[in-house]
Amino acid sequence: MENLMIPEGYRPPLSIRETEVAIKEVKDHFERSLAKNLHLTRVSAPLFVRPESGLNDNLNGVERPVSFGIKEQNDKEVEIVHSLAKWKRYALKRYGFHSGEGLYTDMSAIRRDEDTDNLHSIYVDQWDWEKVISREERNDETLEYTVRKVYAALKETEHFMARRYNYIGEILPDDITFITSQELEDLYPECTPKEREYRYAKQKKAIFIKQIGKTLASGERHDGRAPDYDDWELNGDIIVYYPVLDTALELSSMGIRVDEAALKRQLALAGCEERAELDFQKSLLGGELPYTVGGGIGQSRICMFYLRKAHIGEVQSSIWPNEVVEEAAANGIPLL
């Protein structure tokens, strides 16, 4: 079955009930570590936003948001969020955060156009975080420093879970390896972007691929990024090698966010300069929003990774094709 991988000899080491307990342990410990390492305060977050606000994440520009009308407001349309990438920057200003301070939130999203498999679901849950920085801190040094702080939280959580559950073991290396998307293309010119990620992650075990969204020397992009939150020169993905599925597993997408000049440039490159008229983008271009670094960290992804699960549906409750549910059950993989 194309969208279901069954690892040879896989048997879940925990029952469904034991898994639910372990999920909470992972989430509680990682959340505390992340907040401590980055000096973050937890805040409440929206499940839906108004389209005209410009606050929703347009992802690659083709994914359709789930929308509905509010009866009390003459069926005024709102959209379920794809992520909170832009909302967080707006919130930092509204809530009065200063340089060196940040926020994080539990985000739930629906991505109706997602192609599901062992790693992908139409339901997305992640810690969305954002931190205020100065204009002078918009550089590669700040990016790498912040990546290492996030990676330290990942390492701390794996160490904690490995002590709680003997079967887990520690597989993350002490340090994360940095490489740009162009360097990766130069290293494996014959490979697709996903193949490059797999080969390099398998070699280094934990990597951060920088500069995602920009066009490479080949004329292709490593991956898509919306033009109005990450600066494509100062962003990237944390990816680890996951031996259970013999695959590269993205745990986090993050970056230093666009300033006024980067937003103008990237809107033009993406051919969507009309977005400059939306509320969020107008505020940014007008210099009304703080400079920030931020990202999203998949909650189900890291639970799957730490608990050594074969399918993301073992750690989150979602909807899957009937044939996937039946095939998974027949092979001892219980989807929640």
Where are these regions (language model features)?
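Extended, charged alpha-beta segments that form solvent-exposed binding/catalytic grooves
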Residues: T105-E195
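Generic recognition of stable, solvent-exposed alpha-helical segments in well-folded globular domains
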Residues: E18-E25, H29, R138-Y145, K149, ...
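A general structural signal for short secondary-structure junctions and capping/turn motifs
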Residues: F68-K71, K93-S99, L119-S121, G169, ...
